[in-house]
């Protein structure tokens, strides 16, 4: 075990994490040069397109160091985005060290900081890796100073590399062997293994990625998931090189995979403890928690015929990603669809993009919302996932919404614009620290303000330089109301949103104006209203077509003309009372793009 090194790679998006993993594999000759391709560990099409890592990946590398000892290096390539921060924390718990990759041209970013602090909490040995030193704009000394001043760790063991050109990779491998400690554990103890991640394989069922802390896992033994008590018989155990390779057993300190004919990824919770069903360990490994979605959105197929196809597609995606939830719902305006829960906005985008590309589904999405807590006057507390389920306002005592603690890292030049943006979004400043030419701004913000366009606006006002990290920071009471959109006296449930009362009139007017442009004119007048309870706060009218019923008349008595106009008036009145306004799907999609 003394020659095993388990380490994770921590980096912000686009700082060269997956490229560095490619170079480490090349240096250790883990992959046939003919099969080598960029971002080898990012297996999903969407990961390669967006240049992001969504699922944790692992690879075992064999390395002969300068001391002529043979070492086994287990590398875990973790997601970098805030939505997947729990997966990162479990990947880090499986390791003893981390490579902190920082772009020599951009310096530290907010999400890098958040993940480094998680690594420090796990008592990791951290090796700073300053990447992209081949670029003319690289400033490695400034980045070293940032790492020392902001994170407070030594940069004496920092390694300067160019993942693109392969410069410094040999020195980095020597540093991994020298500075990262070997794993601790006892093969003779009862089995205790950490579930790092899981995914679905069409032939093997659910494949589980594990780090064995104590004991060993062999094929044929019966294992138990400690969070739910489910028992399974292990069929295969193996390692990734990065190809799957079966082995006879996984021993304490090692990272690998197992299969056990598990049919549902829902039974395999990231962070769970796996033990021997016949001789179980007595305690969980620390840090396990059930993942809960924080952003909710309804998905409806544009064609009602595709409802069953959407259900099957969501079930297939759920096999690989059990962190999103879905349940069927129906809307009077949009028909049958699903109410889905996600870990964040990137998670929502990834799932909807996969539905579009992999399953060829055209979807209508409702406005994203968060989970509100409604305290009733009878002291009961309800959780509101969908604005259409809002109870009678007269029975509500107060409403609470989730707040987050956001860290924004940006160049000092843009601090004024970003503070203005945070204040617009009802933010409360917690801290502001300047390091070198960068500022770290900490704000408390309502999550509902973040899920719309905050990230886009932040990038816009900072010319793309700001980076954001956030974590849920409890619930707070707030002045919230349900904004309803009423068309010709009928409420359109798909357009209902929960909103902060002082912003309701502006948002209501924006939606009404947008709908006025989008709804086609009918033979009768269409009233579009935004209302809170029974009170209308904004109104627009779509004027009717006017058919010239008197065109066929020439000369004669004016009473004939009056009679025809009166008949038209009565017809329009009857039409208005029985006519249903036909709102095209595109109108919903456009109206919901209105930003609060």
Curated annotation (Swiss-Prot):
The keyword Amino-acid biosynthesis does not apply. One of its GO terms (biological process) is positive regulation of translation. It is a peripheral membrane protein. GTP binds at residues 14-19, 131-134. Keywords: Cell inner membrane, Cell membrane, GTP-binding, Hydrolase, Membrane, Nucleotide-binding, Protein biosynthesis. GO terms for cellular component: plasma membrane. GO terms for molecular function: GTP binding; GTPase activity; guanosine tetraphosphate binding; ribosome binding; translation elongation factor activity. Its main location: membrane. Transmembrane segments: none annotated. It is found in: Cell inner membrane. InterPro entries: EF-4, EFG_II, EFG_III/V, EFG_V-like, EFTu-like_2, G_TR_CS, LepA_C_sf, LepA_CTD. Belongs to the TRAFAC class translation factor GTPase superfamily. Classic translation factor GTPase family. LepA subfamily. HAMAP family: LepA. NCBIfam families: lepA, small_GTP. This is Elongation factor 4. It comes from Neorickettsia sennetsu (strain ATCC VR-367 / Miyayama) (Ehrlichia sennetsu). The lineage of its organism: Bacteria, Pseudomonadati, Pseudomonadota, Alphaproteobacteria, Rickettsiales.
């Amino acid at each position: 075990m003394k020659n095993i090194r388990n380490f994770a790679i921590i980096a912000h998006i686009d700082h060269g994490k997956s490229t560095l993993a490619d170079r480490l594999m090349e240096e250790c000759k883990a992959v046939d040069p003919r099969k080598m391709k960029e971002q080898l560990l990012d297996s999903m099409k969407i990961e390669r397109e967006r240049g992001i890592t969504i699922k944790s990946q692992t690879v075992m590398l064999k390395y002969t160091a300068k001391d002529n000892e043979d070492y086994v290096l287990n590398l875990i390539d973790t997601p970098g985005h805030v939505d997947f921060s729990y997966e990162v924390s479990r990947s880090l718990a499986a390791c003893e060290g981390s490579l902190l990759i920082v772009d020599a041209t951009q310096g530290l970013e907010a999400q890098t900081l958040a993940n480094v602090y998680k690594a420090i909490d796990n008592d990791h040995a951290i090796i700073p890796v300053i990447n992209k030193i081949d670029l003319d704009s690289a400033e490695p000394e400034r980045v070293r100073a940032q790492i020392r001043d902001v994170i407070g760790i030594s940069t004496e063991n920092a390694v300067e590399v160019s993942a693109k050109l392969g410069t410094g990779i040999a020195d980095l491998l020597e540093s991994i062997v020298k500075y990262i400690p070997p794993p601790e554990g006892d093969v003779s103890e009862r089995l205790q293994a950490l579930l790092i991640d899981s995914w679905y394989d069409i032939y093997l069922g659910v494949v589980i990625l594990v780090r064995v802390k104590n004991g060993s896992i062999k094929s044929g033994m019966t294992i138990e998931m400690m969070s739910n008590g489910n028992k399974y018989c292990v069929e295969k155990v193996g390692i990734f090189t990065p190809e799957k390779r079966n082995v006879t057993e996984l021993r304490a300190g090692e990272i690998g995979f197992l299969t056990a004919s598990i049919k549902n990824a829902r039974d395999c919770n990231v962070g769970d403890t796996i033990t021997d069903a016949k001789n179980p360990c007595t305690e969980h490994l620390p840090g396990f928690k059930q993942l809960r979605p924080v952003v909710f959105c309804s998905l409806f197929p544009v064609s009602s015929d595709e409802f069953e196809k959407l259900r099957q597609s969501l079930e297939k995606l759920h096999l690989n990603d059990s962190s999103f939830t879905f349940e069927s719902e129906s809307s009077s305006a949009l028909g049958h669809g699903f109410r889905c829960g996600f870990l964040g906005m990137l998670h929502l985008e990834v799932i909807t993009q996969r539905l579009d590309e992999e399953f060829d589904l055209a979807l209508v999405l409702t406005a994203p919302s968060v989970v509100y807590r409604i305290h009733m006057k009878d002291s009961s507390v309800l959780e509101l996932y969908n604005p259409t389920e809002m109870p009678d306002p007269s029975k509500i005592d107060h409403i609470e919404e989730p707040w987050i603690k956001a860290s924004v890292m940006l160049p000092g030049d843009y601090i004024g614009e970003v503070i203005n943006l945070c204040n617009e979004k009802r933010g409360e400043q917690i801290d502001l620290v300047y390091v070198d030419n960068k500022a770290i701004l900490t704000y408390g913000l309502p999550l509902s303000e973040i899920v719309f366009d905050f990230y886009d606006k932040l990038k816009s006002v900072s010319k793309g330089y700001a980076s954001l990290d956030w974590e849920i920071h409890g619930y707070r009471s707030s002045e919230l109301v349900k904004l309803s959109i009423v068309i010709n006296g009928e409420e359109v449930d798909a357009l209902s949103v929960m909103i902060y009362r002082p912003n309701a009139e502006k948002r209501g007017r924006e939606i009404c104006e947008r709908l006025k442009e989008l709804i086609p004119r009918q033979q009768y007048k269409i009233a579009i209203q935004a209302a809170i309870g029974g009170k209308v706060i904004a109104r627009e009218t779509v004027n009717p077509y006017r058919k010239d019923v008197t065109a066929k008349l020439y000369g004669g008595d004016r009473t004939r003309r009056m009679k025809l106009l009166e008949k038209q008036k009565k017809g329009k009145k009857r039409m208005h009372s029985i006519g249903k306004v036909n709102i095209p799907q595109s109108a919903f999609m456009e109206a919901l793009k209105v930003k609060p």
